[in-house]
């Protein structure tokens, strides 16, 4: 794949690079510049624009293309505006320059996650409007903050507000992942993030003595139990070629804390774990298992949640479902090979599904290495432009789904 010269650059690519240069990088994202960008884009495209401040300084921007039948539920195209931090010394180019090399690769934080999809939504809608299309269902595009740090000041709050319910969303699309093969991955559910702190208390004393009932000994037992569970899930994944990473529960020990000096046995120690719980797991039973591991370690061992999501939903992926039939049917017409999976991490889709709206995660990037959150995150302009073509077909198909039972 080769690149066009600057004078020949496709306008969609130019807009993409313009958006990439907006520094919406955590922990201090410039959300104001992003909101202004979408306001101006809405003005140029003749779309409705609504700003919803879900928390001080956290604005959800909603762009709307009304359908011809307002009694039907709408299509929601969601994307987040923030991106993760960078380590500039590990990048070949300035991570916010949107540098394009001679081969057509665009290097910028957010190129894959997920500013490409935001612009693909906009360019798909623009193309359909220019071609004179109208659809029965209203199309809403939501651009939300805070996803990269959990969405607690973004989509989690937005779905609880009357402005969200007024959108009357019947189906949603959100982010997915690149796929290095010829296929396109589509995500119909995701694992639930549980961030757990285990705290162990025991006898303190001088470190020269063989103390009994120490915090470290008991914490060691819990850590061993959890890591043994981790190994069991890893082996289950490795032994079954039909399983993907999102189908099992993962856990990693991410922090160890405790102690004040080399020669003092601490009274308290703690360990932090990041669990990603598969959607078919019995959440109540799994929490009871955590409790059991702590009890087996001895007295004074407890756990608490820093984050806990317990409402995993699965979007149907069979042809009897009208939304899936429209989505997969459009992909089939484009001869795209789909690989339905459970998303291994977490996205804002979980909040959308939790309020009863089916959602699919889809970033149309095949033959592309997965580079989100990585150094030198990049996307080829040809892959990006094909994604615009794909989303144009998908938006048209979804916005044309006939009235469903209960819709008049």
Swiss-Prot record:
Top EC category: hydrolase
Classification via Pfam families: M20_dimer, Peptidase_M20
UniProt cofactor(s): Zn(2+)
Catalytic activity, EC: 3.5.1.14
A GO CC term assigned to this protein in UniProt: cytoplasm
Record organism: Rattus norvegicus (Rat)
Active site residues per record: 82, 147
Residues with PTM Phosphoserine: 408
Annotated family: Belongs to the peptidase M20A family.
Protein name listed in UniProt: Aminoacylase-1B
Positions contributing to Zn(2+) 1 binding: 80, 113, 175
The entry's keywords: Cytoplasm, Hydrolase, Metal-binding, Phosphoprotein, Zinc
